[in-house]
């Protein structure tokens, strides 16, 4: 479908469904899927129902009330949360893990780094929201550690998709943000104006590699939301209230 992005690395696994939604001017509110940003909820729900019916069918979505934390929640039952209304969303959480069939875990973003993960041996999926605060707290690495501790996942088995986000070409920050990432040589740059460019997607990738994920098991979309704001919501570029969804689930 033209209004979604999918990873090639997940395409060989027939027991999962995944997608990243895209901005679409033909849809209400340009296909925003966020209930929490103040837009008309009936139109957001219309978009959610449409994309759910056309792609996943009989699956239940679980979303979180994202707070730029490093909190991780394991979803242990099949029950929609945060999909039909925002009040039922998982509270104060930025990463979701499940092995329950029929559950789609997802994160909503408009520049932050969305990461989808899959353990094909143990049939476990996860969705991670990594802004600069979450990246500083190593939320992706902590999510994988939680899978190891809870389910005995082997990092070498884990397959990862890094969805569209603002990238090192465009993510300009002050020193108060950049100072947290100076250990990642080659993934930041000091500009002539005294600010820094920071490459959050590759910092998250480096964190996952440090725990033993194989590089060939990580697919980076290499799509910058700031550069491709016509296809993906970018808060930095347009100050939009729209958000796109990155989601994965076990059939």
Task: Give short role names for the model-derived ranges.
Residues 1-251:
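Active-site microenvironment for binding and transforming phosphate-containing groups
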């Amino acid at each position: 479908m033209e209004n979604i992005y999918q990873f090639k690395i997940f395409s060989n696994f027939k027991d999962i469904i995944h997608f990243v939604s895209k901005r679409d001017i033909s849809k209400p509110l340009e296909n925003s899927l966020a209930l929490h940003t103040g837009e008309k909820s009936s139109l957001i729900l219309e978009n959610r129902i449409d994309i759910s019916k056309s792609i996943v069918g009989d699956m239940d979505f679980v979303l979180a009330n994202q707070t730029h934390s490093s909190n991780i929640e394991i979803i242990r039952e099949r029950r929609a949360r945060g999909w039909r209304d925002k009040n039922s969303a998982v509270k104060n959480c930025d990463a979701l893990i499940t092995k329950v069939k029929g559950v789609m875990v997802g994160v909503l973003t408009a520049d932050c780094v969305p990461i989808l993960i899959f353990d094909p041996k143990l049939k476990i999926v996860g969705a991670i929201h990594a802004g600069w605060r979450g990246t500083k707290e190593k939320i992706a690495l902590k999510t994988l550690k939680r899978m190891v501790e809870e389910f005995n996942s082997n990092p070498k088995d884990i397959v990862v998709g890094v969805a569209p986000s603002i990238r090192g070409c465009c993510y300009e920050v002050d020193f108060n943000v950049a100072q947290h990432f100076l250990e990642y040589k080659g993934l930041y740059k000091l500009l002539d104006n005294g600010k820094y460019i920071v490459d959050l997607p590759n910092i998250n990738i480096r964190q996952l590699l440090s725990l033993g994920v194989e590089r060939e098991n990580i697919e980076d979309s290499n799509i910058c939301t700031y550069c491709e704001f016509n296809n993906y919501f970018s808060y930095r570029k347009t100050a939009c209230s729209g958000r796109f969804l990155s989601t994965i689930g076990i059939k």
